[in-house]
Amino acid sequence: MSGLGIMLLTLLLLVFMETSHQDAGEKQATQRDAINVRRRRSLTRRVTEECEENCEEEEKHCCNTNNGPSCAPQCFG
C-alpha cells in the first residue's frame, strides 16, 4: 500500500473515532439532563406536599411565590 493510502486510512480512522466520541458525549449529556430533571421534579413535589400539609393545618392554601411555596388565605396570580 502506498504512503497516500495509509494516510487516507489513518485520516478516516481518526474521523470515525472523533465522531463516535462526540456521540458518546452527547448521549452522556442527555442522560445527565434527564437525571437532573427527575431530581428537580421529586424535590418540587416533596416541597409542595409539605406545603399543602402545613397549610392545611393552618386552614390556608399553599401558594407558589417568588420565594417558594408559602401559606396564604388566598392565592393570587
Swiss-Prot record:
Compartments, as annotated in UniProt: Secreted
Single GO MF descriptor: ion channel inhibitor activity
Name of the featured protein: Conotoxin ArMSGL-0143
Disulfide bonds: 51-63, 55-71, 62-75
Entry keyword set: Amidation, Cleavage on pair of basic residues, Disulfide bond, Knottin, Neurotoxin, Secreted, Signal, Toxin
Superkingdom of origin organism: Eukaryota
Source taxonomy: Eukaryota, Metazoa, Spiralia, Lophotrochozoa, Mollusca
Record's signal peptide: 1-22
Keyword Disulfide bond: yes
